[in-house]
């Protein structure tokens, strides 16, 4: 079921998203390098709770962490452990925030100061995809297949590979709502964007292969053959004249 949000609901969701933006601004690479993932997870939890909000992912479907911290070969859904975030690493922070029942789900990727140039280029390409190909597709009555196809075409033309098994989704009242928004698809297929939709769009991109596997903890989604990967997630509100990005 697709939940079309009222103006009051969008206002509440924006408050949750404002906390995400504060998390992203505060937790810079300089603050996090050298820390264990479990420490980073707790620091973000404390920051969110100081804003009178909760970590939405904790306990969701049994998830044991507070936030998804995906280091290096982990693409998404990483559970924080004792591993230290080092200068050569990639760390994706996927943050779920529950502010009095209004939800934000968004992610950003950080690279250490000694990250491989290929990882740097990948992150730049993923971040630029939002303004170059995603946002031009965000308008009322556009089929979601057009958005999915635009994402697929952009990344495949650059020689990248996309995670096929996971995608974006509706959000705001529940963590995962309809519609499913895959990062691949055919034009003119799927439901059409409607005014009042709040959606998460999240390219999950790899350099060498689209193959993934599940870690022994049944949470961390790992690359199987790809050396580098990147995941960025933004939330959008579809309006009568286009969109609002709620998380950037």
From Swiss-Prot:
This is Methionine aminopeptidase. HAMAP family: MetAP_1. Removes the N-terminal methionine from nascent proteins. The N-terminal methionine is often cleaved when the second residue in the primary sequence is small and uncharged (Met-Ala-, Cys, Gly, Pro, Ser, Thr, or Val). Requires deformylation of the N(alpha)-formylated initiator methionine before it can be hydrolyzed. The keyword Hydrolase applies. A divalent metal cation 1 binds at residues 94, 105, 233. Its cofactor is Co(2+); Zn(2+); Mn(2+); Fe(2+). GO terms for cellular component: cytosol. It comes from Mycoplasma genitalium (strain ATCC 33530 / DSM 19775 / NCTC 10195 / G37).
């Amino acid at each position: 079921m697709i939940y079309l949000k009222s103006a009051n609901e969008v206002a509440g969701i924006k408050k949750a998203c404002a906390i995400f933006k504060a998390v992203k601004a505060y937790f810079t690479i300089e603050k996090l390098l050298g820390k264990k993932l479990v420490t980073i997870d707790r620091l973000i939890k404390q920051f969110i709770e100081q804003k009178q909000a909760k970590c939405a992912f904790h306990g969701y479907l049994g998830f044991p962490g507070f936030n998804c911290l995906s280091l290096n070969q982990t693409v998404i859904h990483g559970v924080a452990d004792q591993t230290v975030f080092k200068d050569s690493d990639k760390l994706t922070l996927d943050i779920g925030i529950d502010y009095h029942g209004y939800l934000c789900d968004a992610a950003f990727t950080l690279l250490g100061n000694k990250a491989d140039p290929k990882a740097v280029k990948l992150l730049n390409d993923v971040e630029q995809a939002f303004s170059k190909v995603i946002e031009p597709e965000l308008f009322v009555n556009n089929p979601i297949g057009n958005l999915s196809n635009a994402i697929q075409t952009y990344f495949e033309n650059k020689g990248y590979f996309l995670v096929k098994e996971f995608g974006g989704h509706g959000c705001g009242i529940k963590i995962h709502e309809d519609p499913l928004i895959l990062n691949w698809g055919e034009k003119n297929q799927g439901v059409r964007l409607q005014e009042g939709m709040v959606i998460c769009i999240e390219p999950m991109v790899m350099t060498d292969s689209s193959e993934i596997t599940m870690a022994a903890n049944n949470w961390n989604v790992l690359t199987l053959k790809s050396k580098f990967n990147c995941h960025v997630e933004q939330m959008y509100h579809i309006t009568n004249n286009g969109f609002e990005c709620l998380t950037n």
